[in-house]
Amino acid sequence: MTDKTSLSYKDAGVDIDAGNALVDRIKGVVKQTRRPEVMGGLGGFGALCALPQKYREPILVSGTDGVGTKLRLAMDLKRHDTIGIDLVAMCVNDLVVQGAEPLFFLDYYATGKLDVDTAASVITGIAEGCKQSGCALVGGETAEMPGMYHGEDYDVAGFCVGVVEKSEIIDGSKVQNGDVLVALASSGPHSNGYSLVRKVLEVSKTDPEQFELEGKPLADHLLAPTKIYVKSILSLIEKVDVHAISHLTGGGFWENIPRVLPEGMQATIDESSWQWPAVFNWLQQAGNVSRHEMYRTFNCGVGMIIALPAEQADEAVALLNSSGENAWKIGVITQTDAGDAVVIN
């Protein structure tokens, strides 16, 4: 009988010990996100969460998202600490536009070879995003898959569930002629348009760590974490009658605003009401990107747009600014029989 080498999972490229070490590293930060409705801790086959008792007719709202090729830029620049905030933001911001309070979040982290330090940095960012949005990080999956990803490259996805009172769902059906649009400033490109960002960097031969914009590296502008608007919006909808909220993500102004407009309504955006942050001016100039394409690809400094009655617009702006946002009136809703759903002038 010939002797054969005894193979292990580690020989195949999967390090179970590294996975266990990661769990030990992240337990503390995950615990900080806990909500009273969560039952049990990490390690179960499934996470249990009760519905908050304040809801009479609770409706669950769910969403899933990633961070696109912003992740490639983060990996290239070896900056992993805020990409987790981006991941949470992309999910919870999509929930809150419907009036939903985020309850719990799960993440999926996949890599060719698990680097515990990198993964811990990413998941610490996820926990920070959960704290900012008031939702619990109840579980996740870390998949080490040799041969599926190059080296220590990784991908992340997020999954979030929230709850809203049935009678208070925000779906755009109340939008009407004369409504005012209020904008909330973004922190940068957020997590959209990064394939174009990377192409502009390539074509312009720009090193984002060396090139400075407004006194700091371009990389700082490009990797600024996506703003999480949950707490300020949940506070706002308790005080004013919000008709619709649009989260400006992929598709920019042209595609996201119409998603919350009833048929026959047109949003007119006043371009003079704000100035593009420097990073967007740089992207447009360095990439010779058309104005239409900028508004189609990027948020251009606007992360959210809220439609509400004209008589409540000033109050809404004041409330949002007092909660730490940079808010302003950006446009109006009018009735139209024809033409584009969004006009920017």
Swiss-Prot record:
Organism domain of life: Bacteria
Intracellular or extracellular location(s): Cytoplasm
Pathway: Purine metabolism; IMP biosynthesis via de novo pathway; 5-amino-1-(5-phospho-D-ribosyl)imidazole from N(2)-formyl-N(1)-(5-phospho-D-ribosyl)glycinamide: step 2/2
EC code: 6.3.3.1
GO BP terms: 'de novo' IMP biosynthetic process; adenine biosynthetic process
Record Pfam families: AIRS, AIRS_C
GO CC terms in record: cytosol
Disulfide bond positions: none
Enzyme class, broadest EC rank: ligase
InterPro entries hit by this protein: PurM-like_C_dom, PurM-like_C_sf, PurM-like_N, PurM-like_N_sf, PurM_cligase
GO MF, one annotated term: ATP binding
Keywords annotated in UniProt: ATP-binding, Cytoplasm, Ligase, Nucleotide-binding, Purine biosynthesis
Catalyses which reaction(s): 2-formamido-N(1)-(5-O-phospho-beta-D-ribosyl)acetamidine + ATP = 5-amino-1-(5-phospho-beta-D-ribosyl)imidazole + ADP + phosphate + H(+)
Record HAMAP family: AIRS (MF_00741)
Family from the record: Belongs to the AIR synthase family.
Name this polypeptide is given: Phosphoribosylformylglycinamidine cyclo-ligase
Organism, scientific name: Pectobacterium carotovorum subsp. carotovorum (strain PC1)
Organism lineage string: Bacteria, Pseudomonadati, Pseudomonadota, Gammaproteobacteria, Enterobacterales
